[in-house]
Curated annotation (Swiss-Prot):
Cofactor requirement: pyridoxal 5'-phosphate
Catalyzed chemical reaction(s): (1S,2R)-1-C-(indol-3-yl)glycerol 3-phosphate + L-serine = D-glyceraldehyde 3-phosphate + L-tryptophan + H2O
The protein's name: Tryptophan synthase beta chain
Listed pathway(s): Amino-acid biosynthesis; L-tryptophan biosynthesis; L-tryptophan from chorismate: step 5/5
Transmembrane segments: none
Record key words, sorted: Amino-acid biosynthesis, Aromatic amino acid biosynthesis, Lyase, Pyridoxal phosphate, Tryptophan biosynthesis
Organism expressing this protein natively: Francisella tularensis subsp. holarctica (strain LVS)
The organism's taxonomic lineage, starting at the top: Bacteria, Pseudomonadati, Pseudomonadota, Gammaproteobacteria, Thiotrichales
């Protein structure tokens, strides 16, 4: 029986109750078979093209870095059906569920984007869907909650702990432990127990593959850097995967610095966490001196996660990728700028990556560079959050 590698260097693994091991083994074997099955690959490709709208555009910005010698491109995952990159891998996993003969899907969601993507895939492929969501996130992401319900999903608010994404993850895992024989846990990011980090990366890698082809067609060369926000890390690993062997292309992930790293209110475990076991994997983790998990914080619900995917930890450890951070205020400024200068409303998550790209462009305006930001999602879901913040600041 062929197996995938469960670790990325020292990170990853499969730290789960024994009861879930057969379900994870089954998932791994189905994935290996599917990857070798041309009909599966063709169906996945057709769904991505005909239903989700791939390939997504690579848009050159016109105004936002006008006074610099930087050329800044945006990989437009915001244009994907469902509003974010999440749709890519959800369609892949949902097809795997059909192959396994299961009829129910369990999911967790933070910003609601993964929940929406799961709900639409379940509606399309006739699967029963229940989504766990932190009660706090249910409040701050009401449009996405209603979208999920419109598409037939059951949304279950989680009130335990900090009532955010990590608590939703724990509840979803509990549900799966009780119902694994008939239900599949459709994990929303490139984290969690093996084989999820590998499966999610492979079902997101078209982001980087398309970017590479589009960049060669537009500029005749590869970018100097690709930049993506990092919460759990799926949009970033989807962008990075095809560039890992291109040593001249910098890979830059941007974690949420929240109210400032020094305040402790952030979501940057890669640079400011300690290695621990959480959510079925060994990975960097925000924890206190007693080893208890600390609550993460970010203006964007989708980055509000105290850990990170194991491959990102490995890429940092071997020096292949760099990880920066952007504060709430920096992300908000980038959000406003893209709206005003380019007519694009980005997700607050993606705005963190954009903030770092703008920093690179303006810290040396005379430097010629070619940058790509993965615009991982659109900001419709965030307009009420932004409205309230700007009102509080007296800007509107």
């Amino acid at each position: 029986m062929s197996k995938l590698n469960a670790y990325f260097g020292e990170y990853g693994g499969q730290f789960v109750p024994q009861i879930l091991v057969p379900a994870l083994d089954q998932l791994e074997q189905e994935f290996i078979k599917a990857q070798a099955d041309e009909s599966f690959k063709q169906e996945f490709k057709e769904l991505l093209q005909e239903y989700a709208g791939r390939p997504t555009a690579l848009t050159k910005t016109r105004n936002i870095v006008k006074n610099t010698r930087t050329k800044l491109y945006l990989k437009r995952e915001d244009l994907l059906h469902g509003g974010a990159h999440k749709t890519n891998q959800v369609l892949g996993q949902a097809l795997l569920v059909k192959r396994m003969g299961k009829k129910e899907i369990i999911a967790e969601t933070g910003a609601g984007q993964h929940g929406v993507a799961t709900a639409l895939a379940c509606a399309l492929l006739d699967l029963k869907c229940r989504v766990y969501m932190g009660a706090k996130d249910v409040e701050r992401q009401s449009p996405n909650v209603f979208r999920m319900k419109l598409m037939g999903a059951e949304v279950i608010p989680v009130h335990s702990g900090s009532a955010t994404l990590k608590d939703a993850c724990n509840e979803a895992l509990r549900d799966w432990s009780a119902n694994y024989s008939k239900a599949h846990y459709l994990l929303g990011t490139a984290a969690g127990p093996h084989p999820f980090p590998t499966i999610v990366r492979e079902f997101q890698r078209m982001i980087g593959e398309e970017t590479k082809q589009q960049m060669l067609a537009k500029e005749g060369r590869l970018p100097d850097a690709v930049i993506a926000c990092v919460g759990g890390g799926s949009n970033a690993i989807g962008m990075f995967a095809d560039f890992i062997d291109e040593k001249n292309v910098k890979l830059i992930g941007v974690e949420p610095a929240g109210k400032g790293i020094e305040t402790g209110e952030h979501g940057a475990p890669l640079k400011h966490g300690k290695t621990g076991i959480f959510f079925g994997m060994k990975a960097p983790l925000m924890q206190n001196s007693d080893g208890q998990i600390e609550e993460s914080y970010s203006i964007s619900a989708g980055l509000d996660f105290p850990s990170v995917g194991p491959q990102h930890a490995h890429l940092l450890a071997i020096g292949r990728a760099k990880y920066a951070s952007a504060t709430d205020d920096e992300a908000l400024d980038a959000f406003k700028l893209l709206c005003k200068k380019e007519g694009i409303i980005p997700a607050l998550e993606s705005s963190h990556a954009l903030a770092h790209a703008l920093k690179l462009a303006y810290e040396d305006p005379n430097k010629e560079q070619l940058l790509v930001v993965n615009l991982s999602g659109r900001g419709d879901k965030d307009i009420f959050t932004v409205h309230d913040i700007l009102k509080e600041k007296g800007e509107i």
